[in-house]
Amino acid sequence: VGQRQPAAAGATGRAVLARRALDDAAIAAVHAGIRWKSAPDPQEFIAQVRAAAVKGWAIDNGQINHGISTVAAAIVDTGGAPRFVLSASMFSGRENAEGMDAIGAAMRQAADAIAQSAYAMEMAT
C-alpha cells in the first residue's frame, strides 16, 4: 500500500513482458532500468520472462521487496495485448514451490476468465 514501482518490476512486470513480443535485448534494457532490492542477472530475468510466457504467470521471490513473494498473471485483450494484471502477494516462505505453482495456475485461470468476460463483446463482433 502506498508504494510505487516501475511498471516492469516484480511478478506483474514479468507477466506483462511475457505477453509482449520483445526480443532479449529489449527485455535486458527493461531490466537495466529497474531499481532492484536483489537484482537477478539479466539473463536470469530474461529466462523468467520466457518461462512466464510458457506458464501464463510469473513470480517474484523478494527481488523487489525483501520478504515478499508475488505471483501475477496478465489479463489480455482479444489481440493478446496485456491490459491489466491480477496478482497475489504473500510473505516469502509461506508457500513451497508446489504451492506457488498452484497459486500461479489459479491466477492464470482467473485472468483468462476475466479477459473472456471483459472482452466477450469484442470477441462476438
What do the PLM-derived regions correspond to, one by one?
Residues 1-64:
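Short, solvent-exposed recognition segments
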Residues 27-35, 108-125:
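Cysteine/selenocysteine-centered motifs that mediate thiol-based redox chemistry or coordinate metal-sulfur cofactors
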Residues 38-113:
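Extended hydrophobic
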Residues 1, 66-69, 124-125:
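Long hydrophobic alpha-helices with heptad-repeat/coiled-coil character
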Residues 23-24, 78-79, 122:
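Short, flexible segments with low predicted structural confidence
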Residues 20, 99, 118:
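Short, flexible helix/strand-to-coil boundary loops that buttress conserved ligand/catalytic motifs
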